Amino acid sequence: MKLLPKILALSLAMVVTTSVAANQLANEKTAISVNYKNNRYPLLQKPYIELPIGSIRPTGWMQEQLVRMKNGMTGNLDQVYEKVMGPRNGWLGGDGDVWERGPYWIDGLLPLAYILNDQALIDKVKPWVEWTLASQKPNGYFGPDTDRSYEPGLQRDNSRDWWPKMVMMKVMQQYYSATGDTRVIDFFTRYFKYQLAELPQNPLGKWTFWGEQRGGDNLMVVYWLYNITGDKFLLDLGELIHKQTFNWTDIFLNQDHLSRQLSLHCVNLAQGFKEPVVYYQQNQDPKQICAVKKAVKDILFAAPLYSRGNSPRLT
């Protein structure tokens, strides 16, 4: 009988310890959910959550490689390729290139700047971000809006094309990840309301086929914003964007494009690969996943510009 008080005391201690541990774990999970958002219902939960840009600092070999990029073309493309990336660029308000090349550069330069916490690179990125924010019209449109006559070496037409904006959307998403600048949330909310109203009469393929084939890039940012704001109209926009995007699921499951040479633009294919998986978060139809798995089995991904079927030759 003398053992009973000891057993009871030990049991009580175990309960208290377990309860404290459970509370600590719950608090940790709450902290994680506050700082690192997973998908909001009804989107499918993701197994991994991307950390904010700059939360991990490079050292050693990785730091050396990033510094080489900073000192090389990535950090100096505005000087090496000034005709396109210099002050005449349409994404800086100039009368030069208005299409994808400027946004493409900043898509790489911005994360490099904030990962290295390099003020010189940040100062180089900021004019592009600030011009983009300031360019937004009352109806939500942003970016260059004026087509100009041909000039050798510049892309001065299709200024209203959906595709270059998808690249700049990724830039702005990364900028928010690195800085938490809340202007970006309002910026995207207004733009996506514009898209929801405009896409029915001016679909993704209106100006060029690039936006239609790469609509998954647009869709990713729509879901990203939905996870922050919970605005239901974003789910409607997600369905609309998927409907207007090239049907990669059907291509992968039912057609022979991946076995034929020169059937697909390889960059479109590389970016299209993700669209069924991105949409699966909302649609949750297993065929979206099956399509991508089948595509991975069907293709030897080697191409200069256009797909080579299952041939390893690049020429």
Where in this protein do the model-derived segments appear?
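Bacterial N-terminal signal peptides that target proteins for export
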Residues: 1-8
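Low-complexity intrinsically disordered segments
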Residues: 4, 14-15, 312
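Bacterial N-terminal signal peptides
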Residues: 9-17
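Cysteine-centered metal-binding/redox modules
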Residues: 20
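Glycan-recognition and catalytic cores of secretory/periplasmic carbohydrate-active enzymes
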Residues: 23-315
